[in-house]
Amino acid sequence: AVDCNTVKSDLVGCVGYLPSGTGNPTPQCCDGVVKL
């Protein structure tokens, strides 16, 4: 699992993370994120 605080503090803005069930990284990737 990816920690939401780690994702939010990442300066590249969630690159390398995807919201579960989608194919598009977003700034709101904290919800149900999975590591690529």
From Swiss-Prot:
- Task of the protein: Plant non-specific lipid-transfer proteins transfer phospholipids as well as galactolipids across membranes. May play a role in wax or cutin deposition in the cell walls of expanding epidermal cells and certain secretory tissues.
Superkingdom in the source lineage: Eukaryota
UniProt keywords (A-Z) are: Lipid-binding, Phosphoprotein, Transport
Which InterPro entries does the record cross-reference, listed alphabetically? Answer: Bifun_inhib/LTP/seed_sf
Q: What is this protein called?
A: Probable non-specific lipid-transfer protein
Cite the source lineage. Eukaryota, Viridiplantae, Streptophyta, Embryophyta, Tracheophyta
Q: Which family does it belong to?
A: Belongs to the plant LTP family.
PTM: Phosphorylated by Ca(2+)-dependent protein kinase.
Native source species: Pinus pinea
One molecular function GO term is: lipid binding
